[in-house]
Amino acid sequence: MPRYGIAIDSTKCVGCHSCRVACQNQNGLESNETFNWIKNKNRGQYPSFDKEFIPLQCNQCENAPCQRVCPTGATYTSPEGVVLVNPKTCVGCKYCMEACPYRMRIIDHQRGIVEKCRFCIELVRDGGTPACVTTCPTQVRIFGDLDDPKSDISKFIAETGAQPLRPDLGTIPKIFYKRS
């Protein structure tokens, strides 16, 4: 079974939010809801001012704190290694939201449940890739099997030295970043 991950080359991100819109469309989210965020980071001072855009999403942690604190087992890891939420057993207690050190979950107030990025698992199981990956005009994201040394994602990580956010937390994220 593959161990899926995403590598993000934030040096290519132009902050267009195509990933966010594709995610919203794929997941039926409202315009004020998203599983993808773009953090804007200012660098330098005028006149040598620059802006870095950092795409953020659930890190699909192998040691997921959100999963450990879920009292109903609604947060679980799929056979593909994707951290998911079962909407039928989620009671909306928000323990998982508090436990996530990356703050990458949202509450669906209408349904009273917590939601998060699912790596578009329905597309992946049909041989596709997540919507945020396919829609990006600058190919910021690379999706693939982290355990396959010949995969594009593994090659990218090896060649660029891409790292997860906050490896010191011990969550073992499956999202890797190349930053400037």
Question: Which positions does each model-derived feature cover?
Answer:
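Non-ligating segments of multi-cofactor redox enzymes
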Residues: 1-180
